[in-house]
Curated annotation (Swiss-Prot):
GO biological process: DNA transposition
Family to which this protein belongs: Belongs to the transposase 7 family.
Gene designation per UniProt: tnpA
Keyword terms: DNA recombination, DNA-binding, Transposable element, Transposition
Protein name: Transposase for transposon Tn3926
Species, as recorded: Escherichia coli
GO molecular function (one): transposase activity
């Protein structure tokens, strides 16, 4: 029987925790007439109250209250109120043990409660084993068991029995998983897997370590090296379909555990477990390398296009002076010809008066040389980089197993033909080669008088392949990011069942006719209202004219003088402390470090200061090596080991949720909002040193490569989500991820972004998923309104109404596809960002992409109409975005080492940097909130009058009182006792 504990003390308490919210108490503990009739049959007030309380405990949480266990006070008060008797009667209950036993027997008889038996235990283990095939999280299994027992009215056993059943289920599931991954392996498979643990020829690393290395710079040499990695993975030739034998969560967990092991550690594993771990590593490694190869190709193509654009611009600029001279010269000649016509003189003589005829004739020849064709384009410069692509293209096309949707069949046909040419060493493209995929822009380069140009044909095919992979029209066997679009979605059968049962997890009517009727009726009403207000010049702080379009008066963002004085006063009271002291104090309040559990054992970190040191190394961008030097008593080896086993995306996420929830529960945070609105924004960090090649360039941030940390922040200043994204991808791609996949208790209803955060697709999905979307759109007057029919009724809005009309037929035709997509995103079958990237990359004619865009246009138009009518909406959005920008300033101050540059080549390490930074800024926000409340109380206690309406101007984002630099010591200079706080700084003399 497994002995290892799989639940923490906090998790054990949570399983039997009683509700304290009033609505939950009412839901669980309200008696009906039958209940009251049975209760009233007891003799004496104490017995009636005790019997009723025991009934409540048996129903929820499912236990029987022991002799020495006092009842939960809110529950006792509620029961006593229903029975109309004093709570003091409880003290007289159950003085005889026999009374309690009799009550338990009667409760079982009357209400059908059953004791937990060995038969139930065996059934529980059997049931939980099926769940354990999906997850080995102890709390998930134990919670499922407890809920199942409650549904069956089975009295919960002791907690160690629940934990033992869950642990046994995990052990059984592990055996089944190992068997599923190894039973089909033959002797050659096992021999090839064993080779992974041996040292690579001529190298100091094992084959496994080499295969798991990330690619370096996006160039042909590194591409070829990575292709060799994929070929090595493929050479294992694992049994077909083996990756589908095990749930993805468990496969990832086994692979992650194996990735932290040394070859010596893996060799010590029991045989079946060792081969299962190596198979999991191979499956995940193959998918990762496949995706990385496609990403490398995407980035190489992007670099070549950028280089061609730059060369094109440089050449044009270089000829700029000559072109200008010619324009000025022809201006003089033109003026001379005009004067000659007016005077009736000889035009040729007029030209020769400006310059000799031979010089004029030569200038015409020069002008023809300088002139560019009407379809002036940089694309011809791509041909100069053909050799770069040619170095890896044959291997690239040969190693990927591609499939295509009908829309991309032409691209795949061209790829197949290129593969054949590569294998036959053919140089000339056949005259009957596929050409339907060639866009007009490429046609003039590819299709020449001498036939098909091989160089541009291959460049065009590889470029179009990149686009088709992005959109999902072409997918790759063995990939995670580039699968068939349909594979990402909820299965059609499951979707149909959910829709039929009216159980789709969406916030809208799922009947298309009803939905469109309601939204279009609202749209027409809003259009009429705003048109009337615009005609009467009644729009608040806004005006629409035919001549100048929409003009909106900017908001006054000044902070009242009284509020500024309060900000200054409270800032002077906040205690000075080190960042290490702040983190220790916040951990004392929240226990967030307990969430950084061991990957294998789920134990908490034994050395909390070592864990905090590792987190801080991420947050301040110092890295483990330098942090070990700055933190006495710490070594790199210790920090590296702790990071490998305790620091993961999910542990950072749950720890962050702990801090966000603590901020949500702070009464003082209510001055800034109720936790139902949020904003998101991207913050650019340059990539340097080894990480420079992993960065992307966005002209918005200059010419240096970088990464974006995309962060969501609540109206209470809590940063509840952070994600590392490419600077070249629009912010809107990631807006929904933060709203859907955070783990905090926040229930966001309204969300704000800047212009980069919106697209019509995002507007549509936001509405379907139950969020009110409110972006601050730059140049709003140029953002058109969309209506379903003629604009004659809306004369005042004509400058803003698009000439295109809403395509309602397209929405109707693809309604079920829209619902299925939204359902898949809501249920977590696929991330919103992945789907939005693919939809944004689709060709214009794709039905689903167009239908979702049209639905989004309805919602965008409704939003703009609201914006025109409501100054309050504009203020909310402005205030929300200002909070995000202020939080970015704090993040920049914390992330100050290494010049604020990201220098980690590994994307995993870059994610840890972002997560550590977000966690520490959340801790600073919480600490500041607690002490701002104490500071305002101190000011009031000193006789200072504070206006409650001005408290909203205080901000928990200050860091002037926090020492972020120096040696990182974890011994507090001012020890704070449990439940106590640091003294504020003295109040300044009046």
């Amino acid at each position: 029987m497994p002995r290892r504990s799989i639940l923490s003390a906090t998790e054990r308490e949570s399983l039997l925790a009683l509700p304290d919210a009033k609505d939950e108490l009412i839901r669980h503990y309200t008696f009906n007439e039958t209940d009251l009739s049975v209760i009233r049959q007891r003799r004496g007030a104490a017995n009636r109250l005790g019997f009723a309380v025991q009934l409540c405990y048996l129903r929820f949480p499912g236990t029987f209250l022991g002799v020495d266990e006092p009842p939960f006070p809110p529950l006792l008060r509620m029961v006593a109120a229903q029975l109309k008797m004093p709570v003091e009667s409880w003290s007289e209950y159950g003085q005889r043990e026999q009374t309690r036993r009799e009550h338990l027997v009667e409760l079982q008889t009357v209400f059908g409660f059953k004791p937990f038996t060995m038969s139930h235990y065996r059934q529980a283990v059997h049931t939980l084993t099926e769940l354990a095939l999906q997850t080995d999280k102890g709390i998930v299994l134990a919670s499922a068991l407890v809920e199942n027992l409650r549904r069956q009215s089975i009295i919960l056993p002791a907690m160690n029995a629940i934990e033992r059943a869950s642990a046994e289920a995990i052990t059984r599931a592990n055996r089944r998983i190992y068997a599923a991954l190894t039973d089909s392996l033959l002797s050659p498979h096992r021999q090839r897997l064993d080779e992974l643990l041996k040292r690579k020829d001529g190298s100091k690393v094992t084959w496994l370590a080499w295969l798991r290395q990330s690619p370096a710079k996006p160039n042909s040499r590194h591409m070829l090296e990575h292709i060799e990695r994929l070929k090595s993975w493929q050479a294992l030739d694992l049994p077909a379909g083996i990756e589908r034998q095990v749930h993805q969560n468990r496969l990832l967990k086994i692979a992650r555990e194996g990735g932290q092991m040394t070859p010596a550690d893996l060799a010590k594993f029991e045989v079946q477990r060792r081969y299962a771990t190596l198979v999991a590593l191979a499956i995940e490694g193959m998918a990762t390398v496949t995706d990385e190869i496609i990403d490398l190709h995407d980035r190489i193509i992007g670099k070549l296009f950028n280089a061609a654009k730059n060369k094109h611009q440089q050449q044009f600029q270089a000829s700029g002076k000559a072109i200008n001279d010619k324009v000025r010269m022809y201006g003089r000649i033109g003026q001379a010809l005009i004067e000659a016509k007016q005077s009736g003189s000889d035009p040729f003589a007029a030209i020769e008066a400006v310059m000799p005829w031979d010089t004029f004739a030569a200038s015409v020849t020069e002008a023809q040389t300088l002139a560019r064709p009407a379809d002036f384009d940089f694309l011809h410069h791509i041909g100069e980089s053909y050799a770069t692509l040619r170095r890896y293209a044959p291997q690239f096309l040969g190693v990927l197993k591609l499939r295509a949707a009908p829309a991309a069949k032409g691209v795949l046909d061209a790829i197949d033909m290129l593969r054949g040419m590569n294998s036959d060493s053919a140089r000339k493209v056949p005259a009957d080669a596929p050409t339907a995929f060639i866009k007009p822009r490429w046609a003039k380069l590819v299709l020449t008088d001498d036939g098909i140009d091989r160089r541009y044909y291959e460049l065009c095919a590889l470029s179009e392949l990149k686009n088709a992979l992005r959109s999902g029209d072409v997918w790759v066997q063995g990939s995670r990011q580039f699968k068939d679009f349909d594979e990402y979605l909820v299965p059609v059968e499951k979707f149909a069942t959910l829709k039929l049962a009216s159980e789709l997890p969406l916030a809208v009517a799922t009947d298309c006719d009803q939905y469109l009727h309601d939204r279009l009726e609202l749209l027409e009403a809003q259009l009429a209202t705003v048109n009337r207000m615009a005609s009467a010049n009644d729009l608040p702080d806004a005006i629409i004219t035919t001549a100048s379009g929409l003009k909106i008066t900017p908001l006054d963002a000044a902070v009242p003088d009284a509020a500024q004085a309060m900000i200054d006063q409270t800032a002077m009271l906040l205690p000075h402390l080190k960042i290490t002291e702040l983190l220790m104090e916040v951990d004392e309040w929240t226990g967030f470090t307990r969430h950084f559990t061991h990957l294998k054992t789920s134990d908490t970190a034994k050395d909390k200061t070592l864990l905090l040191t590792t987190i801080l190394a991420d947050a301040i961008n110092l890295g483990l090596t330098k942090m070990a030097e700055s933190c006495p008593g710490t070594t790199y080896a210790k920090l590296s080991w702790l990071q490998a086993w305790h620091i993961r995306d999910e542990t950072y996420s749950t720890a962050l949720a702990e801090l966000v929830n603590a901020q949500f529960r702070q009464p003082f945070a209510g001055n800034w909002g109720d936790g139902t609105t949020s904003s998101s924004d991207g913050q650019n960090f340059r990539t340097g040193s080894k990480a420079e090649s992993t960065g992307h360039i966005n002209p918005k941030y200059g010419s240096s490569p970088g990464r974006t940390f995309y962060t969501h922040i609540s109206d209470q200043y809590a940063p509840f989500s952070a994600k590392v994204v490419n600077v070249g991808i629009r912010d809107s791609t990631y807006v929904l991820d933060g709203l859907l996949y955070h783990e905090s208790d926040l229930r966001i209803e309204e969300h704000y972004t800047d212009t980069a955060g919106f697209t019509d697709h995002v507007f549509g999905l936001m509405h379907l998923l139950g969020f009110r979307f409110a972006p601050r759109i730059r140049d709003l007057g140029e953002t058109k309104l969309f209506i379903p029919k003629g604009d004659a009724a809306y004369d005042a809005l004509k400058p803003m109404i698009s000439s295109d009309r809403l395509n309602i037929k397209q929405i109707r035709a693809h309604w079920d596809e829209i619902l299925r997509l939204a359902t898949s995103i809501k249920q977590g079958t696929v991330t919103a960002s992945l789907m939005l990237r693919k939809l944004g990359s689709y060709p214009r004619q794709n039905g689903l992409a167009v239908a979702l865009r049209e639905l989004g246009r309805i919602e965008r138009t409704l939003f703009i109409l609201d914006w025109l009518q409501s100054v309050e909406l504009r203020r909310r959005v402005h205030a929300g975005l200002n909070k995000g920008e202020a939080r970015n300033a704090l993040a920049r101050a914390v992330f100050f080492y290494r010049l604020g540059e990201i220098r980690d080549r590994s994307f995993e390490q870059q994610r840890y940097r972002a997560s550590g930074l977000n966690l520490v800024t959340a801790a600073i926000v919480l600490w500041n909130t607690v002490y701002l409340e104490r500071a305002t109380s101190a000011l009031r206690g000193n006789g200072t009058a504070l206006d409650d309406t001005l408290l909203q101007y205080l901000s928990p984002l200050g860091w002037e009182h926090i020492n972020l630099t120096g040696d990182y010591l974890w011994r507090s200079s001012a020890k704070v006792g449990a439940g106590k706080f640091r003294p504020l700084r003295p109040l300044p003399p009046a």
